[in-house]
């Protein structure tokens, strides 16, 4: 038996990228090499919110009526993303968002797709849910209101995420299954180094999807 929790998001950019302008461009990798990736170009300046400081650039591209947005955080140093992720806090994130200013600017952003599949057993056990995974009576959790007979336990929890970003916008979905048994900005912002992205609801700040792109080409 599976218990399934799913979330789905499909958003069109408020100002879409011109598909005819998408072309291969170099993307700097953490090891100092580069990869050719399909880079989307806005062509005319588009209205985004952005912030830049000595170590990173932050840009927020809105969807539709601007209730949702993709926030991108790109370290200047291509090798610095893992360090940024290791030290990331909610307060730091809120500080970046608070400094965003609305500006009209040309944007270059790589097309990318992200598929991730992982087991959540270890993280859930670390949060104190060990008993749910104990399959030896009499230590088993009581799942009789969900499953008969009583002798049932969770054997695995898998989480799969899919995100596709293109000229029109973003399509994203996540499913969890449980098995029982930018200061003053330059005229252009180019996302051409490893970056962190979040799809979030702007009013509440709720993050729906969070990911890191190290190589959009996936090689």
Task: Give residue spans per PLM region.
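Secretory/exported precursors with cleavable N-terminal leaders
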Residues: 1-219
